[in-house]
Amino acid sequence: MSFTQPPVSPQHNSNSQHSRSPLRDVNSLDAKQMRKRAWWLIALNFLIPGSAQMIAGSRKIGRVAFIATLLLWALFVVAGLLALVARGWLLSIFGTAFLAEPIAFFLWFFGGLTIFLAINLLRMLNLNRLVPGQRLLPLIALVATCSVAATTLIWSGNTVSAGFSFVSTVFKQQGTIEPSNGRYNIMLLGGDSGSDRFGLRPDSISVLSISATTGAAVNIGIPRNMQNIHFVAGSPMRKVYPKGFDHYCGGDCMINAIYKATTDNYANLYPDAKAHGSTPGLEATRDAVEWVTGLKIQNYALINMKAFASLIDAIGGIDVNVKKALPIGGQQDCVPANNAHLSDCPDALGWIEVGKQHMDGHLALWYARSRHNTNDYDRMRRQRQVEDLVLKKIDPITLLTKFGAIAKAGAALVKTDIPAGAVGTYVDLAFQAKKLGIKKLELVSSSYPRLSANNPDFRYARVLINRALKKNA
């Protein structure tokens, strides 16, 4: 007769294993072991959310949290790979609702889940079993790790949401853009900041030409007072001005007056402008700029100069080396004694003094746009200087830490017809251009005497442009 041990049920066997686990069976642990257990669980909860519950708590909660953790890791790995090899695709996510919105909600959900897991873990730790003097430090560690994880995740969700809001608000057009002769050419206009004058009289006009392959960029500055302007072949404005832009402003027909002339009198010539995210004034200005430069302009970006000040505030201001004292406000040219005496210029509201200064958006805008005691060419130089300083200030760290404020300012800053599908391509090229450095070509008489504002040699201007583009292909 043989005797055998009775079979052990799976449930009994599982319970036996649980009882042998020091992380789960707290009744058999002393205060020292409980302290060690607490630190292990806090570390696991931070590094692998859900693992602490799977080992020492509710396996159901642990499994849900662990699956969410794997999804989060997969999301970060994919984002990291795209950032390295296909940054344009990564940036395109911001313009895709069915991708950006679920990602933002998932990050917010995981941030909330992190807080829930920390509260659940606090109950599991049984800190009352520790020596009284050893209870506070694990509690602080749990709160700190939870705060770091939850804050990071919620901030990440906010960043994705802000990015989508910015892209969907600014880049409303659909489709993509093809390069022209291997380059993307974007017309940049700086509009007056008054609500009743926005865009009606561009303060600054330039063309940013970017190589589609290398990102090498040239910023071509066009003086706002350039005259004898014609329109590119095929432009409806040629019917009105067959011999060039004249008969509107009494012999002083500057290029920046085209916007208002078209808006007020010839808007019917561009019936499809609004449907394509533009305006008749912008389209007429584009036709003129294409004639001046000889370049095909794929897109425009109209900058609201008042909102530009908000962008400067969002990045924490800029540091400017002021070469000449400039008045804030005022309508009279005057020479201040010692660079800053209001008594010499009674209508000025204040002075921007010579020397290195840290400027907020309001002061930087006045520095870039002040008209008095200066000329248009110096004004163009100051505008480019401010633009360069802003671009240099928006480094990856600033972009990440202040993305929400930058995106909010940017949404009010730009009106453009760049389609959402081209945002990734343009931003990717912008990073390359910033790395290479943006070359400048100012079509002004101070640099090229043949380009006088009232009678410029446009053939010569196009030679200069082609030469600059070949050097930066």
Placement of each model-derived feature along the sequence:
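Terminal targeting segments of Actinobacterial cell-envelope proteins
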Residues: 1-52, 92, 116, 128
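Hydrophobic, aromatic-rich membrane-embedded alpha-helical segments
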Residues: 33-68, 72-73, 111
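Membrane-water interface of alpha-helical transmembrane segments
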Residues: 35, 59-66, 93-107, 135-138
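Cytoplasmic membrane-interface segments at the C-terminal ends of transmembrane helices
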Residues: 53-60, 114-136
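Membrane-embedded alpha-helical segments of integral membrane proteins
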Residues: 71-126
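Alpha-helical transmembrane segments
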Residues: 74, 109-119, 147-154, 424, ...
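Internal/C-terminal transmembrane anchor helices
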Residues: 131-162
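Non-catalytic, solvent-exposed segments at the cell envelope interface
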Residues: 155-473
